[in-house]
């Protein structure tokens, strides 16, 4: 069973006055007028309506999953190469830092930098952590959880007592 700790739709626009892109992870892509004042989006076009909900991959929001066997962080870093990224584990935290120097793109020159810090669950095996970058720019940081035999499934026998219970009956 996957349990999403930080669900992407939770931070989506909940109304017309919520700046949906303001807190998203668009590293250096810039904000537009309708991002800061979405009710004025008619200045761009009276027929344009920005979607209030986007997919997690489009928005760049990180996602943290923790299930019974595994801990996973998914992070959209499509504007960074593996050489631009640094992933460190410090005590009970994983720090992901990305930075690339100024480079030219279609609209001029741009530089990007971000820093993310996540707390690792105590049950994660820190000696078996791994990190990979997919071709479409998704960084996946994962690690297995330690198996604690004392917390496994066990059967508790039910004994029968001869005396009645002292608890009041309903």
Curated annotation (Swiss-Prot):
Record-listed N-acetylmethionine modification sites: 1
Compartment(s): Cytoplasm; Nucleus
Modification type Deamidated glutamine: residues: 6, 50
UniProt key word Zinc: yes
Keywords linked to the UniProt accession: Acetylation, Chaperone, Cytoplasm, Eye lens protein, Glycoprotein, Metal-binding, Methylation, Nucleus, Phosphoprotein, Zinc
KW Heme (keyword) present: no
Primary location: cytoplasm
Binding site for Zn(2+) 2: 107
Region ranges (Required for complex formation with BFSP1 and BFSP2): 1-63
Residue ranges, compositional bias (Basic and acidic residues): 148-164
Post-translational modification: Acetylation at Lys-99 may increase chaperone activity.
Positions of Zn(2+) 1 binding: 100, 102
Domain of life of the organism encoding this protein: Eukaryota
BP-aspect Gene Ontology terms: lens development in camera-type eye; negative regulation of apoptotic process; protein refolding; response to heat
An annotated Gene Ontology molecular function: metal ion binding
GO cellular component: cytoplasm; nucleus
Function description: Contributes to the transparency and refractive index of the lens. Acts as a chaperone, preventing aggregation of various proteins under a wide range of stress conditions. Required for the correct formation of lens intermediate filaments as part of a complex composed of BFSP1, BFSP2 and CRYAA.
Name of this protein: Alpha-crystallin A chain
Species of provenance: Tamandua mexicana (Northern Tamandua)
Gene name of the encoded protein: CRYAA
């Amino acid at each position: 069973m996957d349990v999403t700790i930080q669900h992407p739709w939770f931070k989506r626009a909940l109304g017309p006055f919520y700046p949906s892109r303001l807190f998203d992870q668009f590293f250096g892509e810039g904000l537009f007028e309708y991002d800061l004042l979405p009710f004025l989006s008619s200045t761009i076009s009276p027929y344009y309506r920005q979607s209030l909900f986007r997919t997690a991959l489009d928005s760049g929001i990180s996602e943290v999953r923790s299930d019974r066997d595994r801990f996973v962080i998914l992070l959209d870093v499509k504007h960074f190469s593996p050489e631009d990224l640094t992933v460190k584990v410090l005590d009970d935290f994983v720090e992901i830092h990305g930075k690339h120097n100024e480079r030219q793109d279609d609209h001029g020159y741009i530089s990007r930098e971000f820093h993310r810090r996540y707390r690792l669950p105590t049950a994660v095996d820190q000696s078996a952590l791994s990190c990979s970058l997919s071709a479409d720019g998704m960084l996946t940081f994962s690690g297995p959880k330690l198996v604690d035999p004392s917390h496994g499934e066990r059967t508790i026998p039910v004994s029968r007592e001869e005396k009645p219970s002292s608890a009041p009956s309903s």
